[in-house]
Amino acid sequence: MDLKSLIRDVPDFPKPGIIFRDMSPLLQNAEALSFVSHNLLKHVDLTHVDYFAGIESRGFILAAHMAATHKKGFLPIRKAGKLPPPTRKVSYALEYGTAEIELPPGRGNVVIVDDVLATGGTLQAAIDLCLLAGYSVESVAVLVNLTFLNKMTYNDQKVASLVQY
């Protein structure tokens, strides 16, 4: 399936010089969404996975759909201040300043899911957060990997993705 044809390029958004990869058309296509849920993690033995952890906000959509497809639980990795206590928090650097994400503490094996991997800062923070909160990270997966911006790996494996730019 040609997923790239379902990802809209939005030039100069959110600021000049940036090409935003809008996955809204893909999400509106039930066949494509099902394809993503069934094929993004073909390399992962899901029998040991308890949860799909989605990074706010577009990672929620993919992770929740994958969790339902594979009959697993869903964990929301949220911006700080959005979840009731207790939570664990991790700070990470942004282009201008810092951000915090949080997750309830717990146990189990997770696959972390997000829509786009750019520099890897948010994804690395999500990995660190899951470990801090008591979870074991089995794998990480993104729909789109902007490979020209990162060479990120996890446990000596490339981050799973279905679309690369």
Swiss-Prot record:
<dbReference type="Pfam" id="PF00156">
    <property type="entry name" value="Pribosyltran"/>
</dbReference>
<dbReference type="GO" id="GO:0003999">
    <property type="term" value="F:adenine phosphoribosyltransferase activity"/>
</dbReference>
<keyword id="KW-0328">Glycosyltransferase</keyword>
<dbReference type="GO" id="GO:0044209">
    <property type="term" value="P:AMP salvage"/>
</dbReference>
<dbReference type="InterPro" id="IPR000836">
    <property type="entry name" value="PRibTrfase_dom"/>
</dbReference>
<comment type="similarity">
    <text>Belongs to the purine/pyrimidine phosphoribosyltransferase family.</text>
</comment>
<dbReference type="GO" id="GO:0016208">
    <property type="term" value="F:AMP binding"/>
</dbReference>
<dbReference type="InterPro" id="IPR029057">
    <property type="entry name" value="PRTase-like"/>
</dbReference>
<dbReference type="InterPro" id="IPR005764">
    <property type="entry name" value="Ade_phspho_trans"/>
</dbReference>
<keyword id="KW-0808">Transferase</keyword>
<dbReference type="GO" id="GO:0006166">
    <property type="term" value="P:purine ribonucleoside salvage"/>
</dbReference>
<keyword id="KW-0963">Cytoplasm</keyword>
<comment type="function">
    <text>Catalyzes a salvage reaction resulting in the formation of AMP, that is energically less costly than de novo synthesis.</text>
</comment>
<dbReference type="GO" id="GO:0006168">
    <property type="term" value="P:adenine salvage"/>
</dbReference>
<protein>
    <recommendedName>
        <fullName>Adenine phosphoribosyltransferase</fullName>
        <ecNumber>2.4.2.7</ecNumber>
    </recommendedName>
</protein>
<dbReference type="InterPro" id="IPR050054">
    <property type="entry name" value="UPRTase/APRTase"/>
</dbReference>
<dbReference type="GO" id="GO:0002055">
    <property type="term" value="F:adenine binding"/>
</dbReference>
<keyword id="KW-0660">Purine salvage</keyword>
<dbReference type="GO" id="GO:0005737">
    <property type="term" value="C:cytoplasm"/>
</dbReference>
<comment type="subunit">
    <text>Homodimer.</text>
</comment>
<comment type="pathway">
    <text>Purine metabolism; AMP biosynthesis via salvage pathway; AMP from adenine: step 1/1.</text>
</comment>
